[in-house]
């Protein structure tokens, strides 16, 4: 069996966040974790090539990335594609899932990957791949690789993977049963009435959606708050918010601040290249433009505090808990609406989860993020696409005046979203 392995820039040996923007390339044979996979597979398959792409480049150029990676994979004439494992890395998981989608649709061959259950790539792309459940981090590589290899061996032998060795794909298939449906239904009902254990044949999906709140009626009188999962904190990170899997959030006083500088603010986030945010934190938390709009009377007031956590790897449960507490505080201050910004993949999942909880509390909120598919999957209602993962509201390649103009345009789009009635999820392009 000919196998092509897809990896990101880190596991492909190119480098960390500073190389997350590299374009796709192909290398012969196994690379990085592919060496362990080769050993685990034995003679069941041969990794003929490895395709490597930077996480940020893939997610910021999704359609081009899928087409380019597909072309590189097609050249190798594989029988199967392996992606990852991605563990709980959100951008990596989304890239692995997108590769699975395009390969399964265009080449019609199986794709095997590995992800943590809360990786957003699972929910978005599970139907296109056999997804082996992994731990939260690469520390579980030792168990992930053998599990993926075992599943690949079954596919190579023309066998269906055993139930329980992969995450449910959400696909319905026809099967033959010994008893007709009416008899099985009555038996299940009797068990349920007696309080006995029973197993449904078709678990209903759970959709956690929050109806969008009415829009802000008059921006010129509205108090707007800034919230971020992008980790923007005062210099020195006084609350010691962790760079990954944050166990807390911070509430910080803006006072009369009208700009976030390299001397006063930084990011605590470990999920994206911090260079651009540390140079100008307004690229993640747009205080400068919001102050400008406040002075011009476009908004009534910028809330005196901002709220920040690190969304990188942060659990859904913690994101919900932080947002509920933040929402209660916002209500106490009579905040009318919220702009929430996010950066990387799991950060976007965290941010969108927080958006839903703030919305659930009755406050209209807009999510400004780059990885829009994650925000849509989680359930944010008002979404504004951002510039790039490490600088969602800026572009360091532009002169300062032009960059500020770009940021103002994005913030105005976010304010437009807050004043627009919506009856469901809406992306404001």
UniProtKB/Swiss-Prot annotation:
Pfam families: GRDB. One of its GO terms (cellular component) is glycine reductase complex. It comes from the Bacteria. It catalyses: acetyl phosphate + [thioredoxin]-disulfide + NH4(+) + H2O = [thioredoxin]-dithiol + glycine + phosphate + H(+). Its EC number is 1.21.4.2. The keyword Lipid biosynthesis does not apply. The keyword ATP-binding does not apply. The active site is at 344. Keywords: Oxidoreductase, Selenocysteine. GO terms for molecular function: glycine reductase activity. Heterohexamer of two alpha, two beta and two gamma subunits. Component of the glycine reductase complex, together with components A and C. PB is substrate specific. Belongs to the GrdB/GrdF/GrdH family. In the first step of glycine reductase, the substrate is bound to component PB via a Schiff base intermediate. Then the PB-activated substrate is nucleophilically attacked by the selenol anion of component PA to transform it to a carboxymethylated selenoether and the respective amine. By action of component PC, acetyl phosphate is formed, leaving component PA in its oxidized state. Finally component PA becomes reduced by the thioredoxin system to start a new catalytic cycle of reductive deamination. This is Glycine reductase complex component B subunit gamma. It comes from Symbiobacterium thermophilum (strain DSM 24528 / JCM 14929 / IAM 14863 / T).
